[in-house]
Amino acid sequence: MKRNAFEELRVQLRTLKWLGVLRFTIDFNKCLVRENASEERSAWLYLIGVVGITCSLIVYSTYFPSHFIMGKHNTTGNCYALINIRSCSIVTMLIYTQLYIQRFRFVALLQSILRFNQISGSHREEGRFAFYYYTHLSLLIICMLNYAYGYWTAGVRLTTIPIYLLQYGFSYLFLGQVVVLFACIQQILLSILKYYNQVVLKNIKSSKESREFYYNFCKYNQVIWLSYTEINHCFGLLLLLVTGLILLITPSGPFYLVSTIFEGRFRQNWQFSLMSFTAILWSLPWIVLLVLAMGRNDVQKEANKTAKMLTKVPRTGTGLDRMIEKFLLKNLRQKPILTAYGFFALDKSTLFKLFTAIFTYMVILVQFKEMENSTKSINKF
């Protein structure tokens, strides 16, 4: 018996709906995505609530920065921590706002993928999707326990620790589910592309022009358009903001390790070992999100396979030739398919560059810390 289209994403979509985004009704049997008045009101109330809470946190951290100070950190580290939590609040608010503004575009995107997924019967990814989902939730629990212990040990006020945990916990849950949805949709598109690749290849091997080949190639063009245009419009700016936030937050763990532990603030062996482990785990959940968003570029590879096949198609002097040439020129030869709003490609090479940037950023922070220590030493004389 054929399974319902898009059934693999039920849990992810319901989680995002519970978080107040992508609030619409999905009929998995009829491949329909609808938004009604009550769902729109709920989405609006969620947005108002998130904007109000995040703005309140930003104002509170601005007027009472001393409440967020870590007693065992230096001035550079405390300034960096304030920048991080404010940036996290701003990015969360911006992404919530964008998802609300673009909700109709997401409706169209999901409905199109629903239809293609039902046609191709691509239902082989539920195990991988469940792995993505539960890995993210497991990392959320680890992240919160680690943050709670880390802030308590660092000397943060007990009344401020829940604020840190609420902001980072909610942001990691929300942003992580958006990244998981993007990764899952990317895998679904990959399965659909593989299906149409096989169909088009079978048509090519038949060595004859047919309506079936023209029809399948048109469908393939639509899938590429979804991958190249609609996915980038829906997720491009979101991933750009998420990447920037991760790039900002990730050095916090290693920087805390350098600025506290290696300066002898935790002298006992068990304290040193435990805080080293805490610092290592501090940035791990965010790095996993970065890898999940950019660790695979199989959609681009599958599209390139199609390009190689289409170059072997004999030219007939018909409109199909122009269609193939336009496809090769526009969609494959000029730029990558998946990008963060055109700023950079979402692939492994970009992932490596981002890790290099994170390391460079951490070195700069350490240099600021050393300058601060040198200034303090000079002032003593």
UniProtKB/Swiss-Prot annotation:
- The reply on keyword Membrane is yes
Where found, per UniProt?
A: Cell membrane
Q: What is its main location?
A: membrane
User: Which GO molecular function terms does the record list?
Assistant: taste receptor activity
Glycosylated residues (UniProt): N74, N373
Record-level GO BP terms? chemosensory behavior; male courtship behavior; sensory perception of taste; signal transduction
Mention any one GO cellular component term assigned to this protein in its UniProt record.
membrane
Is Plastid among the key words of this record?
no
Kindly give the Pfam families that the UniProt entry links to this protein: 7tm_7 (PF08395)
Q: How does it sit in the membrane?
A: Multi-pass membrane protein
Phenotype when the gene is knocked out: Leads to reduced courtship levels toward females.
Per the record, the domain of life is Eukaryota
* Parts of the chain on the Cytoplasmic side: 1-43, 102-128, 194-234, 295-350
Query: Any stretches that span the bilayer, and where are they?
Result: 44-64, 79-101, 129-149, 173-193, 235-255, 274-294, 351-371
Topology Extracellular: residue spans: 65-78, 150-172, 256-273, 372-381
Please describe the organ and tissue distribution of this protein's expression. Expressed in the adult labellar chemosensory neurons and adult thorax and abdomen.
* InterPro entries attached to this UniProt entry: 7TM_chemorcpt
Which keywords does this Swiss-Prot/TrEMBL entry list?
A: Cell membrane, Glycoprotein, Membrane, Receptor, Transducer, Transmembrane, Transmembrane helix
Name the family the entry cites.
Answer: Belongs to the insect chemoreceptor superfamily. Gustatory receptor (GR) family. Gr21a subfamily.
The entry's function note states:
Gustatory receptor which mediates acceptance or avoidance behavior, depending on its substrates. Plays a role in sustaining courtship behavior in males, possibly through the reception of a stimulating arrestant pheromone.
PANTHER family (alphabetical): GUSTATORY AND PHEROMONE RECEPTOR 32A-RELATED, INVERTEBRATE GUSTATORY RECEPTOR
In Swiss-Prot or TrEMBL terms, this protein is called Gustatory and pheromone receptor 39a, isoform D
Native source species? Drosophila melanogaster (Fruit fly)
